[in-house]
C-alpha cells in the first residue's frame, strides 16, 4: 500500500472535522507528517471513546459537539494516560492483538501538540466555543546532547565506503560491490550538504544540474531550495548517475537513488544502509548510526569552521535561526574549548 493510500485510509476512519483540519493546515506537509498527526488524533479519540464518550461506537462518529464538551481535566487525564496504555488492533492474519504502549516526555508533548492544533483550528473556525488545551502545560523536556560523528569516526566510515573490498566477504561483498557508488554518493551528499533523509530520497534525476553545481530539494512545508554542491559531492553524484544509466530493471525512471528492486529508495532503506556501514565501522552509539547524525555532523563542521550561524540556518533549511542555535550551536565544542583554555584562573596570584 502506498503512503498516499495509507493516509486516505486513516482519514476515512476519522471524523470529517479532522479530515478538514488535515486538508486545510497540512496539505503542504509530507505524507509522513500528515499520517503522524492522524495517528496522534486517533489515539486521542480512542481515549475519549474509552473513558469519556462511551456511547460513541466508531471514531468517525465523533462530532464537533463532542469536542466542545471536552474539559481541561479530560486533557490532563489524557496526558497521564499517554505514559502507559494498552492498544488493541487486528493483525494481518486476523488475530486480535493487545499491546502496551509507552511514551517519553517528548512523545507525550508531540501528541498533545497535535491535539492542541486541532482544538485551535476548531476554536478559530467557530466550531467550539472554548479552546481548553490552552490551559494545559507541556512536559518540561531535558535536552540531551546527541553528538556529531567525530573526525575519526567519519574517516572510518569513508574508508569502509571506498574500500569495502577489505572489510566485506561473501554475499556482503557482492551486495557492497553492486551498490558501492550509490552508497558513496548518498553518504557524501549527506556529509557535504546536510540535507534531510526525506529530501534526499525524493530527489529526481532532473533536480541535479551540473552546469550550476547544484540540485533542488523540496524542504519541509513544500518550499523548494537550491543546494550548491561541494566538488566531492558533485563528482560522486556524477559517477553514480553515469553508472545508473547502465542499471537494468529500473522501474522508476525519475528517481535519483534506486533500490535493488529498481524502485525509488525509501527513508527506511537509507536508514538500514547507514546503520550497516556504521556497524562495520564500529560505531555503536544508536544516535550516531542514523541519517540525522550525518546532517548534524555537517552543521557542526560549519560552525567549527567559523561559518555564521545565519548562513548555517539557511544551508540547513531552517526558517527560524533559533532552531539552529538550539540544536546545533551547542556542539561547537572547539570554540568553547578555546575560550576555556584561555581563561586565567589565578590571575596575578603566584
PLM regions: where:
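Conserved catalytic core of the tyrosine transesterase superfamily
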Residues: 1-350
